[in-house]
């Protein structure tokens, strides 16, 4: 799996940063792409990347502020002509997302050639798809804003060929049953599959946050994440200012990383008040502090393996 950032700015675009959008490539579990937020200009950013709109089969919206949704109507329309024909799309987000999209398409007389399934979140959501589990919880941003916890499928343990041969079962189609099922039958006997394969490997856990100031649900979403993607609109200065606007300060994110035992953290949604050089300087200063956790300020088009 890997994650690519198509927009990393907060509120307004800058010359270096587009507004928010994150792509999650599900390979090797699936050849699908999941998109988180679609700020204005997202489809133009995607044109500069190898990702194709037709491979996007889920879009998750964190909240209804414009820097997270203004790119939706154009991207959805273009998907019809860029490999998305007859390919179903699921859009998950706060209440109002369906009305926003359908009204935009209706008023612009835009027509799609694929079906959309809408799932609007009230307070929380548990969603399952092709072995993936997605948990959504309400954050604290002044309007409904959600964070998503994505747990990838468990990879079954490797088949122990010698152990299976020990009961007389040679390699063949039956091995797939041993690999995927809890028990299997052979010559009238029922066997426990775990006795004939190695330990299953849990898939990575990724937590992706919408805009928020610190709140209780953050911990539940972030705990033991292999990768956390979080906003830090304010990366220096007065923390009270960030929280007054229902946003996070970098110190808030650091506290969450430590409390939730996060392995790796990528920081996005950086205020347009900071240019690239200033972000680099602040990053270098924070990195020198030995109490700082593992983190990175992302830029547009950054891609990270998970």
Swiss-Prot record:
Keywords tagged on the record: Endonuclease, Hydrolase, Metal-binding, Nuclease, tRNA processing, Zinc
Active site location: 67
Protein residues bound to Zn(2+) 1: 63, 65, 141, 211
Cofactor comment: Binds 2 Zn(2+) ions.
GO molecular function, a single term: 3'-tRNA processing endoribonuclease activity
Enzyme nomenclature, EC number: 3.1.26.11
CDD domains reported for this sequence: RNaseZ_ZiPD-like_MBL-fold
Binding residue positions for Zn(2+) 2: 67-68, 211, 269
Catalytic activity field: Endonucleolytic cleavage of RNA, removing extra 3' nucleotides from tRNA precursor, generating 3' termini of tRNAs. A 3'-hydroxy group is left at the tRNA terminus and a 5'-phosphoryl group is left at the trailer molecule
NCBIfam families: PRK00055.1-3 (NF000801), RNase_Z (TIGR02651)
Family note: Belongs to the RNase Z family.
Subunit-structure text: Homodimer.
HAMAP family documented for this protein: RNase_Z_BN
Function comment: Zinc phosphodiesterase, which displays some tRNA 3'-processing endonuclease activity. Probably involved in tRNA maturation, by removing a 3'-trailer from precursor tRNA.
Protein's name according to its UniProt entry: Ribonuclease Z
Provenance organism: Staphylococcus epidermidis (strain ATCC 35984 / DSM 28319 / BCRC 17069 / CCUG 31568 / BM 3577 / RP62A)
């Amino acid at each position: 799996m890997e994650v690519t950032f198509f927009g990393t700015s907060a509120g307004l675009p800058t010359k270096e940063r587009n507004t928010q959008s994150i792509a999650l490539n599900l390979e090797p579990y699936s050849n699908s792409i999941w998109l988180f937020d679609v700020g204005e200009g997202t489809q133009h950013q995607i044109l500069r990347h190898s990702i194709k709109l037709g491979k996007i089969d889920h879009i998750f919206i964190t909240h209804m502020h414009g820097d997270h949704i203004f790119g939706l109507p154009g991207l959805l329309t273009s998907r019809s002509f860029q490999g998305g024909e007859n390919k179903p799309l699921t859009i998950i987000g706060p209440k109002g997302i369906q009305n926003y999209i359908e009204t935009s398409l209706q008023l612009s007389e835009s027509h799609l050639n694929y079906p959309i399934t809408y799932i609007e979140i009230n307070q929380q959501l548990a969603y399952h798809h092709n072995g993936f589990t997605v948990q959504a919880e309400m954050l604290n941003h002044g309007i409904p804003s959600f964070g998503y916890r994505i747990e990838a499928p468990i990879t079954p343990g490797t088949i122990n060929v010698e152990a299976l041969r020990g009961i007389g079962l040679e390699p063949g189609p039956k091995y797939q049953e041993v690999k995927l099922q809890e028990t299997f039958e052979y010559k009238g006997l029922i066997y426990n599959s775990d006795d004939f394969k190695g330990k299953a490997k849990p898939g990575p856990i990724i937590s992706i946050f919408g805009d928020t100031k610190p709140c209780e649900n953050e911990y539940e979403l972030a705990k033991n994440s292999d990768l956390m993607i979080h906003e830090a609109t304010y990366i220096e200065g007065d923390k009270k200012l960030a929280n007054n606007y229902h946003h996070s300060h970098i110190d808030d994110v650091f506290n969450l990383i430590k409390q939730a035992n996060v392995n790796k953290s990528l920081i996005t949604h950086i205020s347009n008040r900071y240019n690239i050089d200033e972000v680099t300087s602040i990053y270098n200063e924070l990195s020198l502090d030995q109490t700082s956790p593992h983190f990175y300020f992302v830029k547009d088009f950054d891609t990270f393996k998970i």
